[in-house]
Amino acid sequence: MFAASLCRTCHQISGEGGIAGPDLTQLGNRFSTKDMLEAIISPSKTISDQYGSTVFFLKSGGSVLGRLIRQDNLKYYISQNPFDTQTIKAILKKDVVRTRVSDVSPMLPGMINGLNPDELKDLIAFLKSGGNPAHPAYASSK
């Protein structure tokens, strides 16, 4: 379910998966099932500074949204696509009038909407267990 619901595209568990979002290997040790479900259902409720996006307001009147990867004296380098973190866009600092941290998570809401109750239980068991199939969380997901 972790791969089928696209979680793996952005998140790692036990060293496998994407890097656009936080590593979820220890999630079950830090958060309750309720907290996990809230974070999945409403990802913008709490956004880690590490993984949030920035809005760059341009002199032209437009704006650009992306995760700030790095910057130098002349440019901001941002990733705009959480499914393709290797594609980086450069924005000239001289073209930016201001920036602000976005209050919208790059994680899309409703990622679990297509799961049936058993699939959702399996996903939560996987998250609670850190991907360990022998973890007791699987017994309670049945």
Where are these regions (language model features)?
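Positions in alpha-helical segments
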Residues: 22, 105, 109-110
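Extended surface/linker regions that mediate inter-domain or inter-protein docking
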Residues: 1, 52, 63-64, 69, ...
